């Protein structure tokens, strides 16, 4: 459909090779994906929905195409919350852009990276300041429930605010967690938390025999008392 006369209307740019390209004044050249752009002009020769990548980050500029670049004029390699935007720590989640300097305004409410300088964390669904990746920095062990514990485990309910999480023997808020795992043996008393021998006497201040269960209460607390 394109003539070989280079001076004619819409001359064939590839007169010796069959092709159907019709964009960028490059007519009649091979166009593998049929999007109108010659393979030599097309940054995505097997994807008919994308053809140009202005910032050379691997994501196409067409917002309606496959994997569209969210920041078409700024090179970036984010791939999780949006494609092709700056991702300082390289975890796949783009840096927040509250002013829209690189593209549309984008905040943590849009799933931007809450920790743009920490490759191990990116989101905090329960807003308790501990990241949801349990294997990452200060990982939240109860990502679905806000909590302030930080001694035995991070981000779980701590009723008395002493830093030790409440026991969770059925795993309602996270993994099963008992006093044996480090949970608070006294979840309603901020001054006590450990009872290694399970005798009901606090190890840190009261139990004179913290590693041996006992019921003594007179001369000393929490030690064996043979006659009761």
What is each model feature region?
Residues 1-228:
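Extracellular calcium-associated, cysteine-rich motifs in secreted modular proteins
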């Amino acid at each position: 459909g394109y003539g070989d006369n280079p001076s004619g209307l819409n001359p064939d740019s590839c007169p010796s090779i069959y092709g159907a390209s019709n964009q960028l004044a490059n007519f009649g050249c091979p166009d593998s994906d049929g999007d109108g752009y010659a393979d030599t002009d097309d940054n995505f020769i097997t994807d008919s929905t994308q053809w140009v990548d202005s910032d050379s980050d691997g994501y196409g500029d067409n917002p309606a195409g496959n994997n569209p670049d969210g920041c078409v004029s700024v090179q970036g390699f984010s791939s999780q919350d949006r494609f092709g935007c700056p991702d300082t720590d390289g975890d796949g989640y783009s840096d927040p852009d509250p002013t829209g300097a690189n593209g549309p305004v984008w905040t943590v409410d849009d799933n931007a990276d809450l920790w743009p300088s920490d490759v191990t964390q990116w989101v905090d669904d329960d807003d308790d300041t501990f990241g949801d990746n349990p294997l990452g920095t200060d990982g939240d062990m109860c990502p679905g429930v806000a909590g302030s514990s930080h001694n035995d485990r991070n981000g779980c309910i701590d009723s008395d605010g002493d830093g030790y999480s409440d026991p969770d023997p059925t795993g309602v808020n996270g993994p099963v967690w008992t006093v044996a795992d480090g949970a608070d043996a006294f979840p309603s008393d901020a001054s006590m938390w450990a009872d290694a021998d399970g005798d009901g006497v606090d190890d840190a201040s009261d139990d004179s025999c913290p590693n041996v269960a006992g019921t003594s209460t007179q001369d000393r607390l929490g030690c064996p008392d043979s006659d009761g």
